[in-house]
Design a protein with these regions (language model features):
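Active-site-facing substrate-recognition patch
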Residues: 2-57
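Short glycine-rich phosphate-binding loop at a beta-alpha junction
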Residues: 57-64
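Conserved acidic residues
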Residues: 58, 120, 150
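Short Gly/Thr/Asp-enriched flexible loops that form oxyanion-binding sites at enzyme active sites
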Residues: 69-75
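Short, glycine/charge-rich flexible loops or terminal/linker lids adjacent to PRPP-binding catalytic cores
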Residues: 76-122, 188-192
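Active-site/ligand-binding-proximal alpha/beta "capping" segment
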Residues: 118, 126-144
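PRPP-dependent phosphoribosyltransferase catalytic core
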Residues: 139-193
Length: 193
């Protein structure tokens, strides 16, 4: 399969610094989801901006905290679903449960109703997608709020897992910047779609 040349900088970085772990886990915490490479985030943000050009977006919704830096380029408010209820978030909230593929557990995500409503046009942003459970949770929150879902941007999609295809089958405008077709823990080889 011919590899897409867009976002080559991201794919090169995944190949250079990504580490494949047991259970089809791709560890990219040195530049994406623990320590953030701000110049790479800027390029990722610009690419999402290009791919969703012409769409009216009033809010970005992500799960804390990986999508926050990426969303900055859109110049609209970024709402992030919290993984734990805090005293700061009291009163009316949207909440749903999501299953984390990487962490192998289910957790609640919470968004205050104050920040998401029927007038919003929402773009979802997340760093990773495997089975798509986090995206399904965010989509449910958008539906519960009465807002309009514009689309979803994923930095790294595991194309060999069902999440991306399931969302596309539901008609979601999904843009994944790097789709991993396969990865080999023994050789360290990562093949992109």
């Amino acid at each position: 399969m011919m590899e897409d040349k867009e976002m080559q900088i991201l794919k090169d970085r995944i190949r250079k610094d990504g580490k494949i772990r047991e259970g089809n886990v791709l560890k990219v915490d040195s530049f994406l989801n623990h320590q953030m490479d701000v110049s790479l985030f800027r390029e990722i943000g610009k690419e999402f901006k290009r791919r969703f050009e012409g769409e009216e977006i009033t809010k970005i919704l992500t799960i804390e905290a990986s999508g926050i830096g990426i969303a900055e380029v859109f110049n609209v408010p970024v709402v992030f679903a919290k993984k734990t209820q805090t005293k700061n978030i009291a009163g009316d909230v949207y909440t749903t449960q999501v299953e984390s593929y990487t962490h192998g557990r289910i957790y609640d995500i919470i968004v205050s109703r104050e920040f998401l409503g029927p007038d919003d046009k929402v773009l979802l942003i997340d760093d990773f997608m495997a089975n798509g459970k986090a995206m399904e949770g965010l989509i449910q929150i958008v539906k519960d709020s009465g807002a309009q879902l514009v689309g979803a941007g994923i930095v790294i999609e595991k194309g060999f897992q069902p999440g991306g295809d399931a969302l596309r089958d539901q008609g979601v405008h999904l843009e994944s910047l790097a789709i991993v077709e396969s990865m080999d823990e023994k050789t360290g080889e990562i093949v992109f779609r």
